[in-house]
């Protein structure tokens, strides 16, 4: 959420930042609503002040036995009692309109973010490792997995398209990957493990920016009785399935003031995530690349404004370390202004090399690390008490540390062997009971 005072102070800068994101200027429209809101608030406050003053004057007039003046003042107060609710309603309506308009506008990019329209304008930052050479043609994970327990047919019977059932060695391998990531972040990177609810309220979704703009991309759960309830009750009492643990973790500080000594607050969770993928029709229809349900390790940091940029670099390094220890080839890119997420000021994507994708392999996103400034904090009313005693908005950051399903794909395709088996990376073998190869079982 944007601060209308900042827009008022620098409308040209606000519009210029929106233009960098490919959006039209909004300051004139927002400031017109703000002017109407401020005028309505002033009129309401003046009416209240006049009513209070007139009420006092009535007592003075009666004391002075000035019946005519007392009568006139009483008539004035009666009129104010009639008009004040209308003035208060006008102020509330303008306030809600401004909040609604502000809530639909994305965060502003930092100055160092590269300008661009889409993913083709993203900038490569660095690369780790190199592509492996194979004595055979690498196969995609869905072909490898067909003999190892990757079952899309059963999943379709259970839930429809974009779901998968993993069995035997593959189920164990995915569990091992997630546990390895969680252990790394909690024992070496200083993150506190959280096991959050998977169902959250509307205001929680609003806090991190999923609502109102991306309502169609969410899965919603409702009690049976609400299916026959009026539409308004259905929307207010529903619960959303988290599209990422970022939603739950970040909102742990909503409507609160934490002490500066508690920051930075670093949180992590390994959870299922649920996405409707409303805009992904026809994309990545094969395999596990794009699923309605998937597992992810999420990293969230709550910081002061002065430390958020350094924390962003630290978070990226933590996510990268996962892939380094798995010895997976990857690259880091800085997203351009036209490809950033709604709540982000700046985003790094980590793309892992998948040798079985496309014609000869492809880089695919496995992690996205973003710094959001105070954008989410304003939506959540999340603040910290600084050393001077004044409450200020925190800065929030989030990143995948990493997507477990896509890490499984990368391991399967990178460590595939000619006989169709998968060599288990060294770092995962302790989580697999010492198993070194996942192979088809007789």
From Swiss-Prot:
Q: Domain of life, per the record?
A: Bacteria
Q: Which GO terms describe its biological process?
A: selenocysteine biosynthetic process; seryl-tRNA aminoacylation
Q: Does the keyword DNA-binding apply?
A: no
The record's keywords, sorted A to Z, are: Aminoacyl-tRNA synthetase, ATP-binding, Cytoplasm, Ligase, Nucleotide-binding, Protein biosynthesis
* PROSITE patterns tied to this protein: AA_TRNA_LIGASE_II
- What main location does UniProt list? cytoplasm
Q: Which cysteine residues pair off into disulfide bonds?
A: none
Pfam families named among the record's database cross-references: Seryl_tRNA_N (PF02403), tRNA-synt_2b (PF00587)
Give one GO term, molecular function aspect.
ATP binding
Assigned protein family: Belongs to the class-II aminoacyl-tRNA synthetase family. Type-1 seryl-tRNA synthetase subfamily.
Record function comment: Catalyzes the attachment of serine to tRNA(Ser). Is also able to aminoacylate tRNA(Sec) with serine, to form the misacylated tRNA L-seryl-tRNA(Sec), which will be further converted into selenocysteinyl-tRNA(Sec).
Q: What is known of its domains?
A: Consists of two distinct domains, a catalytic core and a N-terminal extension that is involved in tRNA binding.
Q: What is this protein called?
A: Serine--tRNA ligase
Q: Which organism is it from?
A: Bradyrhizobium sp. (strain BTAi1 / ATCC BAA-1182)
């Amino acid at each position: 959420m944007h601060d209308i005072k900042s827009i008022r102070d620098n409308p040209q800068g606000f519009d210029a930042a929106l233009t960098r994101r490919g959006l039209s200027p909004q300051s004139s429209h927002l400031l017109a609503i703000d002017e109407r809101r401020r005028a309505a608030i002033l009129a309401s406050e003046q009416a209240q002040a006049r009513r209070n003053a007139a009420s006092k004057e009535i007592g003075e007039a009666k004391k002075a036995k000035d019946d005519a003046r007392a009568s006139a003042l009483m008539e004035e107060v009666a009129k104010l009692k009639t008009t004040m609710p209308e003035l208060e309603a006008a102020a509330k309506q303008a306030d809600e309109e401004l909040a609604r308009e502000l809530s639909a506008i994305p965060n502003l990019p930092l100055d160092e973010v590269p300008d661009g329209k889409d993913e083709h304008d993203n900038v490569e930052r660095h690369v780790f490792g190199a592509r492996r050479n194979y004595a055979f043609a690498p196969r995609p994970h869905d072909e490898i997995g067909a003999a190892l327990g990757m079952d899309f047919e059963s999943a379709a019977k259970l839930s429809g398209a974009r779901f998968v059932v993993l069995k035997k060695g593959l189920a164990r391998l995915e569990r091992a990957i997630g546990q390895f990531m969680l252990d790394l972040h909690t024992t070496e990177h200083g993150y506190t493990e959280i096991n959050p609810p998977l169902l959250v309220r509307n205001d929680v979704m609003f806090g991190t920016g999923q609502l109102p703009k991306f309502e169609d991309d969410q899965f919603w759960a409702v009690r049976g009785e609400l299916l026959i309830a009026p539409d308004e009750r259905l929307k207010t009492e529903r619960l959303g399935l988290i599209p990422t643990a970022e939603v739950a973790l970040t909102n742990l500080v909503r409507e609160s003031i934490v002490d500066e000594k508690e920051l930075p607050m670093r949180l992590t969770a390994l959870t299922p995530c649920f996405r409707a993928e409303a805009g992904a029709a026809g994309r990545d229809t094969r395999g596990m690349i794009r699923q309605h349900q998937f597992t992810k390790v999420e990293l969230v940091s709550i910081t002061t404004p002065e430390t958020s940029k350094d924390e962003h670099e630290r978070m990226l390094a933590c996510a990268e370390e996962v892939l380094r220890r798995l010895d997976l080839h990857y690259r880091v890119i800085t997203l351009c202004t036209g490809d950033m997420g709604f709540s982000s000021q700046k985003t790094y994507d980590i793309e892992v090399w998948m040798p079985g994708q496309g014609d000869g392999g492809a880089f695919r996103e496995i992690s996205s690390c973003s710094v959001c400034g105070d954008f989410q904090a304003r939506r959540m009313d999340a603040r910290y008490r600084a050393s001077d005693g004044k409450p200020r908005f925190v800065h929030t950051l989030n990143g995948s540390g990493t997507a477990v399903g896509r890490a499984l794909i990368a391991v399967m395709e990178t460590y595939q062997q000619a006989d169709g088996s998968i060599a288990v990376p060294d770092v995962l073998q302790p989580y697999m009971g010492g198993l070194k190869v996942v192979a088809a079982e007789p």
